[in-house]
Amino acid sequence: IDKVKMLHDPTSPYAISASFAMGRAMDAEIYDAALGTAYTGKNGNNPIVLPNSQKLAADDKGFTFAKLKKLKRMFDSNDIEEHNRYILYTAAQLDDLLGEEKVTSADYNAVRALERGEINEYMGFKFIQLNGVRDTGKKIITADTVSGKTVRHCVAFATNCMKLGIGEDVKAEITPRADKNYSTQVYFEMAIGAARLEEEGVVQFDCVES
């Protein structure tokens, strides 16, 4: 009974670990849907890929101020709502931006990013750092190796152009496993899915990592 109670205690190690795991699963679902194939039509059998017009090449650079400006221009040109724009990136891209004077200087940015070592919101985007890994051991935000360099595929999107659906809320159980000498198994489950609704509100931007 005490173990079952721990599942519902938000401060318990079980609940905290499960919360992190579920959070990573939701992050991966949203990220994959943003860059993956969306399906339209009455029967959902019409595949739509993210067009090249919604992709920014790395150009052998990391996450620069110039690249951030291009992202803003793309969203503005597509008349995308200003108040719900997000950027998904990793610690490597944050490090790039913290080296950009216009991002860290108080003359340009009231947030004073360099003092805090983080960027929460800038140029109309809210920044979300995703460093979590998948079950495969690879990062949620995927990368390829190009000419010996790691190229990270980051994402900028507007919330009204993406959709996350929760088909089944979290189910939690603690049971002994007879095949494991009756050691305790903690089981969490939920059903989720995500889809890209409008290509104009999603941009893949690639960044070289040093």
Locate each region found by the language model.
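Short, catalytically relevant binding-site loops at active-site mouths
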Residues: 36, 92-96, 133-135
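Sequence/fold signature of self-assembling virion shell proteins
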Residues: 5, 51, 55-63, 100-210
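Long, contiguous amphipathic alpha-helices that act as assembly "spine/axial" helices in icosahedral shell
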Residues: 1-43, 76-91, 127, 172-196
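Extended, solvent-exposed, turn-rich assembly/linker loops in the middle of proteins
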Residues: 42-115
